[in-house]
Amino acid sequence: MLSPAKTPAGIRAEPLVSLENVGVLRNGRWLVRGVDFSVSRGEIVTLIGPNGSGKSTSAKAAIGVLKPDEGRVERKAGLKVGYVPQKLSIDWTLPLSVRRLMTLTGPLPERDMLSALESAGIAHMLDAEVQHLSGGEFQRALMARAIARKPDLLVLDEPVQGVDFSGEIVLYDLIKSIRNATGCGILLISHDLHVVMAETDTVICLNGHVCCRGTPESVSRSPEYVRLFGSRAAQTLAVYSHHHDHTHLPDGRVQHADGTVTDHCHPDDGHHAHEHGHAGHEHDHDHPDHAHPHAHEAGERHA
């Protein structure tokens, strides 16, 4: 198993990566602008937002895959990053074992390989062919591959995409156990605007900029939810309440309080009377359901 590496109690962990007023411009259009957040050792930060809101772009800027056009990104010296992409292109007609998957980007000591697979709960599948794995098992294999080289920061792009509800619970429990065992920081990207991993320390809602941020509210307080999905789900998932002055439309555009509609919103676009700086506010609008994943590929980088 992986050995714990936690920050001593009472000492605030130094950020592994921090973004300050980051903007990424492509073809004359800002994909994201004015993005600020940080991830520290042992911390779980979840980025949520509709399709095309800049979640993957912000994560890539954080780990250095994309260079921001404005603002700055600071990373801990010698930062090691483990990355689980949203989509991994594999020719499923070719034989590929879990063992081979683990070493695609370079050799890996057998001990470290087995330790990572054991942490992911699939050590018994070392010689299994990946095309025979279920969606949840394949995600576990990708997580094992990401943690095998003992990263400081683990970036998970839509880790529960394509997995059924019970599989989501299992994978979120796995992410929690990885964080607890290693003390690594975790940057998690989710397309679900309302339900997030309960262990999340900070939720950041993006739609071209940081719309709002806060902490999740545990769904375990809802007897109806427990009756529907069970106590384990209630302990693993949490509801995040948004608190901003605009509505995310189903197509990803933004409807402002004055009724105007734009592709994205930004604090300096003239539509915002003020920005909220803390969680727990009520608001007078709802988010339509955006629970459909986007399909663009993510660039891959491993520790």
Swiss-Prot record:
GO biological process, one term: response to zinc ion
Enzymatic class: translocase
Membrane topology per record: Peripheral membrane protein
Chain's role: Part of the ABC transporter complex ZnuABC involved in zinc import. Responsible for energy coupling to the transport system.
SMART domains reported for this sequence: AAA
Keyword Transport tagged: yes
Gene: znuC
Catalyzed chemical reaction(s): Zn(2+)(out) + ATP(in) + H2O(in) = Zn(2+)(in) + ADP(in) + phosphate(in) + H(+)(in)
Subunit structure: The complex is composed of two ATP-binding proteins (ZnuC), two transmembrane proteins (ZnuB) and a solute-binding protein (ZnuA).
Protein name: Zinc import ATP-binding protein ZnuC
EC number: 7.2.2.20
A Pfam entry, by short name: ABC_tran
Primary site of residence: membrane
Disordered: annotated segments: 263-303
ABC transporter domain span: 17-232
Recorded GO MF terms: ABC-type zinc transporter activity; ATP binding; ATP hydrolysis activity
InterPro entries given in the database record: AAA+_ATPase (IPR003593), ABC_transporter-like_ATP-bd (IPR003439), ABC_transporter-like_CS (IPR017871), Metal_Ion_Import_ABC (IPR050153), P-loop_NTPase (IPR027417)
Location(s) in or outside the cell: Cell inner membrane
Residues binding ATP: 49-56
Record's GO cellular component terms: plasma membrane
Family label: Belongs to the ABC transporter superfamily. Zinc importer (TC 3.A.1.15.5) family.
Keyword list, A-Z: ATP-binding, Cell inner membrane, Cell membrane, Ion transport, Membrane, Nucleotide-binding, Translocase, Transport, Zinc, Zinc transport
